[in-house]
């Protein structure tokens, strides 16, 4: 094969162990957020106008608004967004919200109403754009910037609207009888419950109020008793036949009955079946075929039946008997007396069909619609006297008014499916048919037909994403606004006003602000590393408004459900009280338009698996048999085995291959992103896998990221979708690169309206929400060719476009002197000195100068009573220099605050006389470094209020910023010039000129040489004879001028923003932010973890020479306890270790071959080895077609270790690991002889050694360690505060007191409870005594005792402490006297 393929070295090449081909593309991982919010905002208006969803739907549902008299109406026309005032970075820096102004076009229509006829005619129409507040915009990475911090709106899982049938599992009644209930849940509006009680009467409840008989509800819908019965029951007609009665025979009704008395044919009089026999379905059918039409019935058969219709004397209109009355002797006599020959009774046999509705009707005391409506009114509004109108209006507004009640499209679809109805999904209110169908279904359930619903099924739970949450919130704001508008329309002279005067947008804007600022679902983004960002955006929470609460959620809700397969990850969920309530979306899952989670499947047609992918929700999937992704297939895509393991309706079973109609897309569609990053997940216990998924999110980005040797193939996807690594927006050639930006001249997708230049600004040492460091580094060089989607810069925790959360370290599994007891970790000093686990954290310190009552605070270098030494890092404005090394207690920003006058001591008077005013009236309130923090100042930002004079430092920062903007503008201008003049030269080269610059002869042919004689700006003066070309030249010219103007306008706008003052909180004159970078090396007490839930704390850092070493002298980097593996059952870490060992072995081998090449220039052995490592298949890089440069580049990349990918559930197996170990020339046991670093003796046994990927977690000892001698005290109790943030003390609690009591250490105990805590006078005395060098003191009364006394006095109990000293007590009489 021709060696043509070049390799740019900008991506990590992995050897793939997966055997299953990837058919479906994994959807973008933050699609959930972006798609939802885009659908809500619909910033660009489509050509046919916006569809009724999202923001448009909200406006449509609230408008038009009419005033109370109907004389005027405010209509909604359309909305649009203005461009945002500040871009994302400016909002981050200035603590603003990234948002765009929303303009709504409203139309006010005023009517003339004819007083006599009441007819309306339009008098006046006014249209106007009204500003309706700012709408937060989503950044490209799916986050929001609110007051300068990045936030994420987490999607919420809630119960889908619709109808649900359930029973109480026998818990309500002591007999354990199942009481069935149905509940209609709308998207918004009143809930309707229909339930059985223990006596089998059907009741209805509205909004969980007092229960009413269900028939009351049906009567309120306009039905009467007879109609209700005929709806729920069939009738049987008894016809008088001499002394007896005859009833029609139907096989359906009699099958399965046991005959009590002989079954007699009414026509012939012969017995067709003797008593005591059971009538089987077959026998019943045979009787009908033989011609049995009717059978004889006695009066006894009639007793206990119920009348199906009223018995009325038509002459007088008197009702003798009502429908539903039970037939007994008296009733039957009445019937015969009235001369009835046919009696219709209800078909109730108390076995298949129960008399529940009939009994409910009998208990119901309401007889008419009016009574029923009044009854419902009394339940809903107790204490108000009902009138027919008010009751009717109230009942209508409960379920039938689209303003108050909304099932939503989802609710209607679910209801149609459950009840077999066919209403349009635009019918969003309940109908009479719906309520009847619900009651019918409930009665059928009670009769033993049908199934109850499982509310934890994902077909019954849906996801509310950002867009929908925001839509609901905005609707609330608009409804608040609506009330105000109505009042205003009625109160002012409507003829003279404009829409603007009616609208106060505050409530709408406040609703939005409240949602982003304080909703439970609006969360501070977890930005520790790129994975934690992605996971946070893909999180599904069952908590939040309208959801569950931790306390109420039982086991069932939290449990894994069969429908979670491929939709919600069964592994990733927090440990602790939220377990199972907060979940993560599976890798391939997406949310459909109804809010249900869908998973992709491959279609199986005629037993062959196709590559057609369909997305199905849980409801749709239940109808199919789905085979797993790892089923064996033959060449043609048919199933190899006769029977295939598949899932059907939540059960796993073996099905014949003909019955299988779908197949999973990929084995990793089962798990979430974090779990899909764990290699050998299939070999780990689920509990540990859960910890592994959760701890990867806490890994701190290290100074040098390194991708894992043993990956899963998910790493590049996470790095790209999280936005940590920068991918090229379009292809082109790299024009300029430095540490802060990459400039690319586009060659693909050139659009005349856009500039031909892409400038990518890299983030340098930005602080993340968790104080970790966000820093991006370019991967490209000037002149490189780039294609769309190529990774051009690495971000935090990424390495060549792969996610890299930790480092590969050489591990030995062995005990070492007890230093790895209880999961502790022993590290080599080499790890510290090589900065393997060193991370940079950026702390932000903020100081504000306010205007106080006594005068303004001042930021200055001139601070009273501070030595020159302490000011050495400050500039003349009193702000620390960039690059200064700062220590605890150092001043970062000097600030003085005026203090009130206090009486002066003679010394102060003297000072004032000598030094003048200044010294006395201010106090030092400078911003100092907190204890225990060392670092380097990396950035300073100064913010000034409008109109406040800027200091030197602010001016310098401003100049720098403007220079940077100018450089950007100039670069873009230069590339634009080069492009445009290049195109111009190409267009006129060799053409005949019709005109030209001064001194140019007309009719001459234009050549490049000729053009060089004139400056470029004069080339535009050339005109050509070809008119079409001349038109193109003019178009190019105008496009060039527009681009220049746009560039300049953009530049001026940015400069103006930099120069103008900043919005400040009230009372703040000036604010300074100082960013300090802290370098944290790993040290004892830091928490580390692998990817398999194997976590531990660093216990000791050992000199390299003491660490165990291999025969070749290589020392282990880290020693882990082998006992951490068996009981935890996370064997994945051992397999990873072996495979990592093989990777490093192969890398070493390649390194040796590289050295051979350098000596002999023979590349063949190297090429062969690499081709052997990366066999030719779809998943691996085409190494066979690499040219020599590419081979060398690849060899240099892998000489530290070959990177491999072992996808979850489809990864390397033991044979693969053994083969790789053998290739690398290592023992297949994966064990080596180790020598003790201290003695040089070999250890008794061989030790498992290899490379494992370790992470340093965010629980760093530097953030936790804390000490205090004196510090702040609580105001009331006067005890020291608690916690590091408050610089508090260590609590000597109840149990510690018991310990001292047990020792009898009385004086120590007294000290603890008094002078070391809250004896105010005592502690000052002790301090003075220590200063004097004296060690005697006396304890006084603790302040908490006084608090107790005051508390008792406030309850009215006077308690006084009699402080009588022993000295004043009379001496006891002497015993001798």
Swiss-Prot record:
Its GO CC terms are: DNA-directed RNA polymerase complex
Query: A Pfam family matched by this chain, by name?
Result: RNA_pol_Rpb2_1
Q: Which GO terms describe its biological process?
A: DNA-templated transcription
Q: What class of enzyme is it?
A: transferase
Query: Which residues form each disulfide bond in the chain?
Result: none
Taxonomy, superkingdom: Bacteria
Q: Please give the catalytic activity noted in the UniProt record.
A: RNA(n) + a ribonucleoside 5'-triphosphate = RNA(n+1) + diphosphate
User: Keywords on this record?
Assistant: DNA-directed RNA polymerase, Nucleotidyltransferase, Transcription, Transferase
Q: Name one GO molecular function term.
A: DNA binding
Span-the-membrane segments of this chain are: none
Q: Which InterPro entries match?
A: DNA-dir_RNA_pol_bsu_ext_1_sf (IPR042107), DNA-dir_RNA_pol_bsu_external_1 (IPR019462), DNA-dir_RNA_pol_su2 (IPR015712), DNA-dir_RNAP_su2_dom (IPR007120), DNA-dir_RNAP_su2_hyb_sf (IPR037033), RNA_pol_bsu_bac (IPR010243), RNA_pol_bsu_CS (IPR007121), RNA_pol_bsu_protrusion (IPR007644)
Q: What is its EC number?
A: 2.7.7.6
Per the record, the similarity remark reads: Belongs to the RNA polymerase beta chain family.
Q: How does it assemble?
A: The RNAP catalytic core consists of 2 alpha, 1 beta, 1 beta' and 1 omega subunit. When a sigma factor is associated with the core the holoenzyme is formed, which can initiate transcription.
Which PANTHER family does this entry report, sorted A to Z? DNA-DIRECTED RNA POLYMERASE I SUBUNIT 2
Q: What does this protein do?
A: DNA-dependent RNA polymerase catalyzes the transcription of DNA into RNA using the four ribonucleoside triphosphates as substrates.
Protein name, entry field: DNA-directed RNA polymerase subunit beta
- Organism in which the protein naturally occurs: Brucella suis biovar 1 (strain 1330)
């Amino acid at each position: 094969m021709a060696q043509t393929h070049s390799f740019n070295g900008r991506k990590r090449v992995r050897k793939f162990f997966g055997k299953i081909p990837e058919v479906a593309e994994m959807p973008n991982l933050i699609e959930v957020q972006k798609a939802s919010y885009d659908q809500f905002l619909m910033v660009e208006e489509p050509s046919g106008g916006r569809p009724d969803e999202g923001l448009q739907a909200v406006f449509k549902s609230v408008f038009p608004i009419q005033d109370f008299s109907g004389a005027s109406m405010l209509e909604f026309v359309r909305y649009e967004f203005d461009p945002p005032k500040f871009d994302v970075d400016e909002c981050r820096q200035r603590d603003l919200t990234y948002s765009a102004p929303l303009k709504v076009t409203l139309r006010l229509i005023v009517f003339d109403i004819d007083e006599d006829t009441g007819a309306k005619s339009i008098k006046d129409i006014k249209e106007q754009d009204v500003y309706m507040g700012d709408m937060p915009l989503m950044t490209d990475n799916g986050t929001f910037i609110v007051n300068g911090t990045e936030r994420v709106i987490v999607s919420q899982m809630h119960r889908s609207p619709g109808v649900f049938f359930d029973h109480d599992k026998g818990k309500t009644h002591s007999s354990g009888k199942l009481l069935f209930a149905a509940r209609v849940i709308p998207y918004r509006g009143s809930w309707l419950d229909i339930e059985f009680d223990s006596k089998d009467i059907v009741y209805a409840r509205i909004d969980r109020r007092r229960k009413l008989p269900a028939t009351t509800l049906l009567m309120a819908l306009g039905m009467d008793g007879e109609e209700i019965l005929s709806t729920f029951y069939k009738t049987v007609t008894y016809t008088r036949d001499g002394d007896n009665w005859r009833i029609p025979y139907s096989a359906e009704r009699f099958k399965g009955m046991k005959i009590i008395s002989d079954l007699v044919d009414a026509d012939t009089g012969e017995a067709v079946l003797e008593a005591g026999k059971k009538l089987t379905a077959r026998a019943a059918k045979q009787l009908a075929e033989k011609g049995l039409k009717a059978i004889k019935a006695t009066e006894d058969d009639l007793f206990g039946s119920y009348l199906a219709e009223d018995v009325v004397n038509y002459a007088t209109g008197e009702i003798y008997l009502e429908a539903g009355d039970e037939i007994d002797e008296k009733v039957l006599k009445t019937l015969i007396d009235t001369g009835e020959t046919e009696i219709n009774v209800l078909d109730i046999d108390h076995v298949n069909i129960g008399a529940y509705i009939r009994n409910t009707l009998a208990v119901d005391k309401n007889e008419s619609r009016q009574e029923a409506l009044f009854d419902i009114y009394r339940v809903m509004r107790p204490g108000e006297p009902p009138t027919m109108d008010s009751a009717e209006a109230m009942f209508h507004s409960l379920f039938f008014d689209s303003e108050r009640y909304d099932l939503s499209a989802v609710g209607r679809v679910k209801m149609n499916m459950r009840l077999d109805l066919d209403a349009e999904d635009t019918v969003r209110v309940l109908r009479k048919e719906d309520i009847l169908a619900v009651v019918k279904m409930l009665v059928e359930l009670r009769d033993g037909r049908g199934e109850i619903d499982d509310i934890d099924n994902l077909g019954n739970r849906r996801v509310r994403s950002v867009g929908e949450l925001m839509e609901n919130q905005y609707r609330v704001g608009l409804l608040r606004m609506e009330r105000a508008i109505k009042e205003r329309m009625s109160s002012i002279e409507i003829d003279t006003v404009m829409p603007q005067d009616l609208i106060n947008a505050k409530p709408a804007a406040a609703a939005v602000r409240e949602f982003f600022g304080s909703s439970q679902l609006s969360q501070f983004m977890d930005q520790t590393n790129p994975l934690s960002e992605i996971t946070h955006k893909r999180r599904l929470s069952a908590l939040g408004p309208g959801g569950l609460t931790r306390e109420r959620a039982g086991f069932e809700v939290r449990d894994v459900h069969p429908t979670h397969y491929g939709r919600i990850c069964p592994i990733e969920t927090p440990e602790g009280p939220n377990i199972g309530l907060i979940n993560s979306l599976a890798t391939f899952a997406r949310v459909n338009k109804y809010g249900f989670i869908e998973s992709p499947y491959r279609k199986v047609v005629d037993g062959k698996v196709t590559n057609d992918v369909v997305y199905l929700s849980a409801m749709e999937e239940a109808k199919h048999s789905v085979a797993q992704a790892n089923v064996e297939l033959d060449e043609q895509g048919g199933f190899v085995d006769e029977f295939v393991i598949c899932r059907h309706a939540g059960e796993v079973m073996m099905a014949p291959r003909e019955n299988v109609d779908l197949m999973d897309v990929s084995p990793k569609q089962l798990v979430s992103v974090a779990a899909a990053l764990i290699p050998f997940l299939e070999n780990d216990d689920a509990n540990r896998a859960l910890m592994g998924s959760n701890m990867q999110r806490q890994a701190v980005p290290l100074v040098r990221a390194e991708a894992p040797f043993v990956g899963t193939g998910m790493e590049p996807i996470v790095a790209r979708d999280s936005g940590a690594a920068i991918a090229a927006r379009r292809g082109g050639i790299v024009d300029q690169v430095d540490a802060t930006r990459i400039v690319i001249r586009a060659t693909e997708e050139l659009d005349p309206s856009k500039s031909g230049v892409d400038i990518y600004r890299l983030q340098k040492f930005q602080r993340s929400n968790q104080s970790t460091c966000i820093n991006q580094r370019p991967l490209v060089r000037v002149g490189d060719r780039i294609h769309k989607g190529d990774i051009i810069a690495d971000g935090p925790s990424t390495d060549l476009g792969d996610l890299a959360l930790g480092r590969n370290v050489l591990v030995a599994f062995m005990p070492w002197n007890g230093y790895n007891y209880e999961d502790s970790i022993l590290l080599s000093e080499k790890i510290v000195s090589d900065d393997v686990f060193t991370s940079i954290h950026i702390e932000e310190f903020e100081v504000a100068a306010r205007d106080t009552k006594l005068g303004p605070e001042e930021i200055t270098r001139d601070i009273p009573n501070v030595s020159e030494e302490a000011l050495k890092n400050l500039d003349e404005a009193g702000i620390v220099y960039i690059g200064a090394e700062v220590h605890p207690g150092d001043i970062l920003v000097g600030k003085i605050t005026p203090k009130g006058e206090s009486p002066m001591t003679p010394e102060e008077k003297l000072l004032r006389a000598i030094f003048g005013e200044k010294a006395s009236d201010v106090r030092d309130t400078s911003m100092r470094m907190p204890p225990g923090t060392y670092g380097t100042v990396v950035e300073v930002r100064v913010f000034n209020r409008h109109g406040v004079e800027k200091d030197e430092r602010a001016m310098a920062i401003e100049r720098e910023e403007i220079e940077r903007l100018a450089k950007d503008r100039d670069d873009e201008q230069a590339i634009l010039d080069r492009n445009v003049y290049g195109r111009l030269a190409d267009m006129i080269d060799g053409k005949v000129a019709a005109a030209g610059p001064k001194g140019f002869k007309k009719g001459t042919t234009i050549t490049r040489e000729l053009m060089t004689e004139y400056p470029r700006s004069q080339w535009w003066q050339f005109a050509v004879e070809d008119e079409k070309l001349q038109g193109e030249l003019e178009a190019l010219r105008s496009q060039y001028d527009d681009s220049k103007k746009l560039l300049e306008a953009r530049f001026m706008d940015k400069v103006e923003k930099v120069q103008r003052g900043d919005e400040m909180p009230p009372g703040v004159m000036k604010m300074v932010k100082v960013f300090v970078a802290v370098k944290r090396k790993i040290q004892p007490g830091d928490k580390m973890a692998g990817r398999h839930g194997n976590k531990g704390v660093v216990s000791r850092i050992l000199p390299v020479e003491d660490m165990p070493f291999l025969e070749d002298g290589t020392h282990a980097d880290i020693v882990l306890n082998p006992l951490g593996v068996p009981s935890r059952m996370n064997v994945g870490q051992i397999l990873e270790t072996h495979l990592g060992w093989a990777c490093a072995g192969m890398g070493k081998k390649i390194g040796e071959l590289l050295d051979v090449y350098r000596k002999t220039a023979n590349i063949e052995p190297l090429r062969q080895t690499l081709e052997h490592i990366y066999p030719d298949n779809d998943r691996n890089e085409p190494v066979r077609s690499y040219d020599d440069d590419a081979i060398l580049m690849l060899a240099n990349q892998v000489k530290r270790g070959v990177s491999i990918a072992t996808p979850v559930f489809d990864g390397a197996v033991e044979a693969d690991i053994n083969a790789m170990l053998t290739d690398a020339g290592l023992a297949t046991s994966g064990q080596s002889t180790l020598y003790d670093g201290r003695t040089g003796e070999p250890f008794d046994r061989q030790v498992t050694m290899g490379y494992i990927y370790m992470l340093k977690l965010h629980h760093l000892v530097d953030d936790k360690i804390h000490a205090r001698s004196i510090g702040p005290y609580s105001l009331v109790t006067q005890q020291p505060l608690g916690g590091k943030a408050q610089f508090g003390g260590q609590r000597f609690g109840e149990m510690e007191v018991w310990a001292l009591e047990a020792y009898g250490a009385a004086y120590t105990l007294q000290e603890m409870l008094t002078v070391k805590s809250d004896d105010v006078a005592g502690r000052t005395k002790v301090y003075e005594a220590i200063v004097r060098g004296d060690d005697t003191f006396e304890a006084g009364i603790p302040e908490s005792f006084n608090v107790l006394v005051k508390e008792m006095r406030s309850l009215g109990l006077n308690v006084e402490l009699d402080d009588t000293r022993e000295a004043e007590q009379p001496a006891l009489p002497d015993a001798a006297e």
